[in-house]
């Protein structure tokens, strides 16, 4: 599995800001969008382009355009919604597929409860977004679902990943690409990433 920890100074700075314990909901939400945008820039760097001729201000001009990529953004509810706008800043025409999965606080196992996928999912590359890759359970369950529906191409974008989650994801779905702003130390006994960001969903939505 291709794993890319994006070490651009802007990303490192913004993730550092997100680790502040008393960060406001507004600021955390803004930073999640910004880092999601920067990760999208990196994750799409291998998209092929083609030359096309358009009518410019002074006549025909040859320009580069993305070649034949149908994209669907797949936020994992609910926290993934906090990164979605950052992706759409760069790919505003992308279709949105929504997958609802929560993690049982006792077993730490993923529990699917909702999905609404874009049409022709089998023809699209899926950019799956979720702030935290902790145990990997929710991400694995989401990719299982997408594959069942015929999707063949995936890129996973997360703010912070734990080594345990990366290992689990690679074992279950070695064909995906993972882009993360940080690979942290470990999971604690409650399944939270350390040092991590805390509960990203609560911080994005202002809930406890």
From Swiss-Prot:
Binds 1 Mg(2+) ion per subunit. The magnesium is bound as Mg-PRPP. The keyword Glycosyltransferase applies. Uracil binds at residues 193, 198-200. 5-phospho-alpha-D-ribose 1-diphosphate binds at residues 78, 103, 130-138, 199. SUPFAM superfamilies: PRTase-like. Its EC number is 2.4.2.9. HAMAP family: Upp_B. Catalyzes the conversion of uracil and 5-phospho-alpha-D-ribose 1-diphosphate (PRPP) to UMP and diphosphate. PANTHER family: ADENINE PHOSPHORIBOSYLTRANSFERASE, URACIL PHOSPHORIBOSYLTRANSFERASE, CHLOROPLASTIC. This is Uracil phosphoribosyltransferase. The gene is upp.
